[in-house]
Amino acid sequence: TDLKTNLLFLVNGLIKIYKYDKFDNEIFLYHIYSNSLISELSNINTNEIYCFSNASFIEDSVVLSIDFLKLQEHFLNNNLLVKELMSSLLKKTNQLQSLVNRELVFDATAKVAYMLVSDLKMFNNLKRQDVSFMLHIQPETLSRVLKKLSRDNIIEIENQQVIIKDEIALNSIFKGVAI
């Protein structure tokens, strides 16, 4: 864990958040998209910001570094930007909830369905190998799931691009499982 005193905010770009397991294998956690808080703020009453994960830029990005003490003094203590900060923190909480679902609750089909619904653009821009790595499933499993979803007329695949045909059916695969 690194200790910081500045909040980091991704103005634009894309960041991958990951950790290493005991065998030095990279474990993908989630992506941070433009206009999102990067820092992991766990307590607004302290002046310390902890970093529990590794991060790497996936594309050219712009990051804003904000002195947390000055942010508190000039804005938060005067009830300015509190709603925006809360919104960013809730977004991070939702990312962590999605991570728990992906790793502990969802089966392979639910993992794929969730990614298709929540980030179809990312899914279509990545190589299938990278998608399977992110979802922690084998490439062969990803291929089988996509074929099944296609057979069930839930998705269509044209030129390696997934097109959602039945979003209600796709959502029903993972909703109710723990969302």
Residue ranges and their predicted role:
Residues 106, 115-179:
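Phosphate-/nucleic-acid-contacting segments
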